[in-house]
Amino acid sequence: MPIKPVGWICGQVLKNFSGRIEGIQKAIMDLVDEFKDEFPTILRLSQSNQKREPAQKTSKIRMAIALAKINRATLIRGLNSISRSSKSVAKLLHPQLACRLLELRDISGRLLREVNAPRQPLYNIQVRKGSLFEIISFPAKTALTSIIYASYAALIYLAVCVNAVLKKVKNIFQEEESIRQNREESENCRKAFSEPVLSEPMFAEGEIKAKPYRSLPEKPDISDYPKLLANKQSNNIQVLHSVFDQSAEMNEQI
């Protein structure tokens, strides 16, 4: 059954009572008029019980007179409409109430089971009877485990040391390789500067013209030959010195 909202229920109740509110209001006003004069007497009778029975008789008589004056058909219709609306409201609310009651019953049952369940300790203490062999072997086991842990620590330390040594050796080899490469480069530079560079001819081949034949020169004087050799050697030494100076400057710049 679908659950109806509260606004719809209130609307249905007002709709059922819309045609009968005037009759019920009139009946209530008549009852109030009849009992209006009796309110002070009722208060006095509550304080003293001497005139209790006559007051009850008069109130009953007046109530009967008021009920006789009220239109019975209107009152009955109003009561019937109230009963029908209350039944419809009860039918609408019955499934919700049943579901809530079932949920409450399940929750209460679960709580009762949890409360009545035997409480277990947080940890179970197991008592074991130790044998003589276990008592004797316990120190040996402890020493063996300590030795194993120490060996593990030594192996780790040895691995760290070996890695450090290998790193240093690698750095040394790299430095030697760099020094060797620098030496090879410097030697190549020296060789390049020491070799003479031939200059290209200043004029084209077409511009060279053959000269007319001349007679051979006379026999040169051999006495000037040692001087020429000495000048040539001094020129060669100056060229070598200049080449070495240039190579040294290039090495310093590198």
Curated annotation (Swiss-Prot):
**Keywords from the UniProt entry:** Developmental protein, Differentiation, Membrane, Spermatogenesis, Transmembrane, Transmembrane helix
Which cellular compartments is it found in? Membrane
GO biological process entries: cell differentiation; spermatogenesis
Superkingdom of this protein's organism = Eukaryota
**InterPro entries recorded:** SPATA9
Determine if Membrane is one of this entry's keywords. yes
GO CC, one annotated term: membrane
Q: In which tissues is it expressed?
A: Highly expressed in testes and pancreas. Low levels found in the heart, lungs, and brain. Very low expression detected in the placenta. No expression seen in skeletal muscle, liver, kidney, thymus, small intestine, colons, spleen, leukocytes, prostate gland, and ovary. In the adult testes, expression was about 6.44-fold higher than in the embryo testes. No expression in testes of patients with Sertoli-cell-only syndrome. In patients with arrest at spermatogonium and primary spermatocyte stages, no expression was detected.
According to its record, how does it sit in the membrane? Answer: Single-pass membrane protein
One Pfam family hit: SPATA9
Major place of residence: membrane
Q: Which residues form the signal peptide?
A: none
Q: Where are the transmembrane segments?
A: 143-165
The role this protein plays is: May play a role in testicular development/spermatogenesis and may be an important factor in male infertility.
Q: Please identify the protein, giving its name as recorded.
A: Spermatogenesis-associated protein 9
Organism encoding this protein: Homo sapiens (Human)
Ranked from the top, the taxonomy reads: Eukaryota, Metazoa, Chordata, Craniata, Vertebrata
Q: Which gene encodes it?
A: SPATA9
